[in-house]
């Protein structure tokens, strides 16, 4: 099997082949010179400096001015470079010839037959031939293998492995399930209060904490950059501190795995450390039968803020489902099933979320079934949200203090550390600070004071019971489609979105009192989440609004909706969550809120007037945008291209804007002159003697040498000089 050597990114295209060095049949080593290429570039040079430049000028400079000093001139210079072989092997054929122009990257230069493609490399050595392999020796981009940073495979091998995996899964009638850990299937905290309550039978939370597991890990020390003695030797590091983690498994997890495991091959993907992930895996999968070693952690992910299925399945994600409590870290990919976050240790949050983008507090913190809770519980919920906010403020304050120290160390360090970026150090500081703040502030103990002898921790979550049904339905849909004859191959990246979109189809939402003020609602998680299920959300009520979502029926928007359009359903947020977990639009009646005092007739009239003005403004704006789009899409070549060859150099009027007509007119004229210069060059090339005519195997260049725009007569002189230089170069 032959390997194509292609023109790489980063060369100063277009380039011209000047010489082919090895002949067909020659054996190439990695790094051997394949060919010589040349390219041209423009330089601006003052001709009165008298300096002796060793570089070859293709043409002489311009004429001197009246005062004896020549103005700066543009000169075309030629440069020659070598192109080296990235691979080892026998040269089978050349796909370019001397004189050919290569216009862009990724054009085939030649083909070789390699003794080994080095498809699998471990620790820098090929597992097939034993040779040391550089990154350039891969056929394509080297891909990291999950769980082992030393193992890499080529794109060719990844495709082969992907096909084999698909065949294996289909033979077993399985799909792939990627599982997040924190707040998806478990909740973890480091508050020492948990251990105290767990060991106190008289504590009201004792029974709820019976099945809480615990483990300990060494805290990762974030040492100062200058942590060394005066003689340059490292200081003795401080003693390692142990941190106790307390883990609550989401209710129904055992039944969930029993239902899902026969249908899915499961993988763990977490933004926690590998040590943490392995400990959690021991708790949720003590025998290792469910996940095995299929664990991807922050240590192997390559990103501190995002997750990507390409890390696990680089060539094909058509059989993959993801479950995670965060949609933003996945960029809301089509494979994602977002779950309601599991919040057992109230007020603690996700201890590993410091490595992820910050989330705004709001509706998602409420969770489900909040309408069934007592007034006292509602007050507690408010306290929980306030407590989380205060904890985050303390974390931010501590991180800021540490960052100032870090910035000072970076500023005074002669050489910054190469092993870690500032971003990585900052994230570690945030993580360390979050653990320390939770341990010292004991948020659970503070919240328990509100309830006295009543239990704070309630274990009534039922998310996984609904989720197992959803996953079973997706599995059935996939294999039903696969069994149909003459149908396109099923793809979960299409199946999952199509099932979701039916839930809130033709629903138009307005949220009241649930999204923090000043937030762009289109960037809010709940708005993005519901949009993946087919809903459209707007900040204000209009003629299309079908649902107003609020906890409080006395808000202005709720009162307005009641008066403006009685058909608008005013519902509690629990209705949204019930639809999301069931993947179907449930009846609104049990969640409908009663509005006792709608707005007055006068207020309604004022609103309708403002709404009418808003509608007129939107229509006017859309009309203007439509007109601009129509102008931009004018087909300038509908009547032919003869107008491009106008020898009188007439200016082309600008149709896009009347306000800046003069400026745009000048710019257009300059661009036309540049294009004409390039067209003349091509015309000269086309009429050149047959013996020296260029044969271009790759795409023709659309860009000539870059010319900086001058002013007035200087610009015309420069254009004339450039044309003379190009003609002299071609004559040579």
Swiss-Prot record:
GO molecular function: protein serine/threonine phosphatase activity; RNA polymerase II CTD heptapeptide repeat phosphatase activity
SUPFAM superfamilies in the cross-refs: BRCT domain, HAD-like
Domain BRCT residues, every copy: 499-593
Chief location: nucleus
Matching Gene3D superfamilies: BRCT domain, HAD superfamily/HAD-like, S15/NS1, RNA-binding
Location within or outside the cell: Nucleus
Additional information: Present with 6550 molecules/cell in log phase SD medium.
Main function: Processively dephosphorylates 'Ser-2' and 'Ser-5' of the heptad repeats YSPTSPS in the C-terminal domain of the largest RNA polymerase II subunit (RPB1). This promotes the activity of RNA polymerase II.
Protein name: RNA polymerase II subunit A C-terminal domain phosphatase
Source organism of the structure: Saccharomyces cerevisiae (strain ATCC 204508 / S288c)
């Amino acid at each position: 099997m032959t390997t194509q050597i292609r023109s790489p990114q980063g060369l100063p295209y277009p380039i011209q082949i000047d010489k082919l060095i090895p002949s067909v049949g020659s054996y190439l080593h990695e790094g051997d010179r394949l060919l010589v290429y040349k390219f041209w570039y423009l330089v601006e040079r003052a001709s009165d400096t008298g300096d002796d430049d060793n570089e070859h000028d293709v043409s002489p400079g311009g004429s001197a001015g009246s005062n004896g000093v020549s103005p700066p001139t543009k000169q075309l210079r030629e440069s020659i470079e070598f192109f080296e072989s990235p691979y080892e092997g026998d040269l089978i054929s050349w796909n370019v010839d001397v004189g050919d122009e290569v216009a862009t990257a990724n054009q085939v230069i030649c083909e070789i037959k390699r003794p080994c493609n080095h498809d699998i490399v471990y620790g820098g050595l090929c597992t097939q031939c034993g040779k040391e392999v550089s990154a350039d020796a891969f056929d394509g981009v080297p891909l990291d293998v999950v769980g082992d940073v030393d193992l890499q495979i080529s794109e060719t091998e990844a495709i082969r492995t992907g096909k084999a995996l698909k065949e294996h899964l289909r033979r077993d009638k399985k799909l792939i399930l990627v599982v997040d850990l924190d707040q998806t299937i478990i909740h973890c905290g480091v508050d020492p209060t948990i251990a105290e309550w767990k060991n106190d039978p008289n504590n009201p939370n004792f029974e709820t904490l019976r099945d809480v597991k615990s483990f300990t890990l060494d805290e990762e020390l974030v040492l100062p950059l200058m942590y060394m003695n005066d003689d340059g030797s490292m200081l003795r590091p401080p003693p390692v501190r142990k941190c106790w983690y307390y883990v609550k498994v989401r209710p129904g997890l055992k039944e969930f795995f029993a239902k899902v495991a026969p249908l899915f091959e499961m993988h763990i993907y977490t933004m926690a450390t590998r040590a943490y992930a392995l400990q959690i895996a021991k708790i949720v999968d003590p025998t290792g039968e469910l996940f095995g070693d299929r664990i991807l952690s922050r240590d192997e992910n390559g990103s501190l803020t995002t997750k990507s299925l390409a890390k696990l399945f680089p060539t094909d994600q058509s059989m993959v489902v993801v479950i995670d409590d965060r949609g933003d870290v996945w960029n809301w990919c089509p494979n994602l099933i977002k779950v309601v976050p599991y919040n057992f240790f109230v007020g603690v949050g996700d201890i590993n979320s410091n490595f992820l983008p910050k989330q705004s507090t709001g509706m998602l913190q409420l969770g489900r079934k909040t309408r069934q809770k007592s007034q006292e519980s509602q007050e507690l919920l408010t306290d929980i949200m306030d407590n989380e906010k205060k904890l985050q403020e303390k974390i931010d304050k501590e991180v800021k203090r540490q960052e100032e120290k870090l910035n000072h160390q970076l500023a005074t360090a002669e050489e910054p550390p190469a092993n870690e970026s500032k971003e990585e150090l900052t994230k570690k500081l945030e993580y360390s600070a979050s653990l320390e703040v939770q341990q010292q502030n004991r948020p659970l103990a503070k919240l328990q004071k509100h309830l006295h002898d009543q239990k704070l921790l309630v274990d009534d979550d039922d998310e996984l019971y609904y989720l197992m049904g959803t996953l079973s339905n997706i599995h059935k849909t996939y294999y039903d489609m696969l069994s149909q004859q003459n149908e396109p191959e099923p793809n979960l990246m299409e199946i999952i979105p199509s099932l979701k979109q039916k839930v809130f189809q033709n629903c138009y939402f307005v949220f009241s009192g649930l999204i923090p003020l000043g937030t762009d609602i289109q960037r809010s998680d709940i708005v993005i989440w519901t949009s993946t299920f087919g809903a459209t959300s707007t900040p204000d009520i209009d003629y299309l609004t079908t649902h107003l979502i609020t906890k409080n029926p006395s808000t202005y928007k709720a009162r307005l909706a009641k008066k403006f359009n009685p058909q608008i359903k005013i519902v509690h947020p629990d209705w949204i969550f019930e639809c999301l977990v069931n993947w179907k639009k449930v009846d609104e009646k049990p969640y409908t809120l009663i509005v006792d005092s709608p707005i007055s007739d006068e207020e309604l009239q004022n609103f309708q007037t403002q709404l009418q003005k808003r509608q007129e403004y939107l229509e006017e704006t859309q009309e203007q945008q439509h007109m601009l789009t129509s102008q931009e899409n004018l087909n300038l070549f509908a009547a032919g291209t003869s107008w491009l060859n106008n020898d009188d150099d007439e200016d082309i009027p600008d149709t896009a804007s009347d306000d800046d007509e003069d400026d745009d007119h000048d710019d257009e004229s300059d661009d036309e002159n540049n294009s004409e210069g390039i067209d003349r060059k091509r015309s000269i090339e086309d009429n050149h003697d047959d013996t020296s005519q260029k044969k271009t195997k790759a795409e023709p260049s659309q860009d000539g040498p870059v010319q900086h725009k001058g002013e007035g007569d200087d610009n015309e002189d420069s254009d004339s000089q450039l044309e003379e230089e190009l003609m002299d170069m071609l004559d040579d």
